Amino acid sequence: TVSAPEDWSVHVPLDHSGEGWIAADFDALVDSPVHAGSLEVRHFRVLDHQHQLLLIGAPPGGWPPSFLDDVIAVCEATCRLMGTPPPAADRYQLVLILLENGYGGLEHDHGAVLHYSWAALEKPEGYRQLLQLIGHEYLHQWNVRRLRPAELRPYNYGSAVISEGLWFAEGITSYFDLALTLLAGRSDRPTFLADLGDELSRVQLTPGRRVQSLSDSAREAWVKLYKATATSRDTQVSYYRLGAATAFCLDVRLRRRNSSLSSLLRRLWGSHGRSARGFH
């Protein structure tokens, strides 16, 4: 249970029972962020699954009238990408926190918490990048939360878990998040190609790509990527960005053989994701 002032609302992505919430186990408990306050709450459905959007903060000019429809379109496009009519989670809570400066998100089994810059929303590309971030975290319902490297399950809370598969988890997702606004009808092909070109250019302009391999970038994430130094750019490369570039190359190669990376991801979901089997 959560005790809060009467004029506050409390939101937890768990099954509600009476005056509180029920977690199936410790993993589910610590994976469920609690938000309480005078929050703007919007409810919507994606292919008949209940979704909740919590908004903490707002752009100076307010949210565009199309915002909720745009979010729904990106979510539905993600489901189509995965070839599964319903989302992977039976309920989903999306939390968006606006700050003066910020960018990022963290996925959970039944939702995600994002932070983003309200200043960035003043430009069209900033709004598009927010939708891409939402798509990125939404896709993690499948790729990461349920389809994941074997070493990430069961959870080990006592030490850092080392996995070369992080590049697949985040790189594949980063590649597809660029396409989700296109698939959702919220951007066009030239814009997608421009965004992809920018992402590839960032990799090309990172000297560290000649020093650190993609698998090493993933394996050394906790000791290098998240502990940046003045020389990091010259000695390291992000497994997100190099992973996305690698995903693009894989997609092109597969398409030349009458397949695609999305088809591969759907096959992996069927063979390893639905059953929560980790992959190697």
Where in this protein do the model-derived segments appear?
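Intrinsically disordered, low-complexity linkers and stems that provide flexible hinges
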Residues: 1-52
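Acidic/polar loop patches that form or flank catalytic/metal-binding clefts of enzymes
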Residues: 10-11, 87-90, 150-151, 183-193, ...
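Juxtacatalytic substrate-recognition/specificity segment
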Residues: 40-166
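Extracytoplasmic/secreted proteins, especially bacterial periplasmic and envelope-associated proteins
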Residues: 66-73, 77, 129, 133, ...
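Active-site-adjacent structural elements in folded domains
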Residues: 97-100, 157-160, 219, 225-236
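Post-HExxH zinc-binding segment in Zn-dependent metallohydrolases
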Residues: 112-121, 146-147, 158-209
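An acidic intrinsically disordered interaction segment
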Residues: 130-145, 195-220
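Amphipathic alpha-helical substructures
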Residues: 190-195, 222-280
